């Protein structure tokens, strides 16, 4: 059973999601308690590879040191694969959601590429036309 504790909804609006990864999170006891109480903010957070380790930066967890860097737990092969993909221009690794799975706190990371303003406008136009089509279908039936 998965219990979602925090979600970063702005990622889907501002970025094109290429891949998803599930990683464990190294937390202190105080941070675990704060996360379970949903005192977490993922906005502005990102993951970065330093050395051969993956770190979560700029994620606010309400404790004594709210924005400290937290180590992410992934296999070395996955980190190496991610390092190669992050070398491409315009790609970043962002936290999508924080959840509990089998009594362990996990973070879902997304390999993302930023959207341009005209891409966002296209998406809005596409959604509007789909809504109009749905309304027309509902009116016919």
Stretches with model-predicted labels:
Residues 26-27, 55, 73, 106, ...:
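Conserved beta-strand segments that form the floor/walls of ligand-binding pockets within enzyme
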Residues 50-52, 56-82:
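Helix-adjacent hinge/juxtasegments
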Residues 2-53:
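A positional/architectural concept
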Residues 29, 49-51, 58, 109-113:
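Flexible glycine-/small-residue-rich
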Residues 6-11, 39-40, 64-66, 70, ...:
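Arg/Lys-rich, often Gly-containing low-complexity segments of ribosomal proteins
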Residues 76-110, 114-116:
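Beta-rich strand-turn-strand
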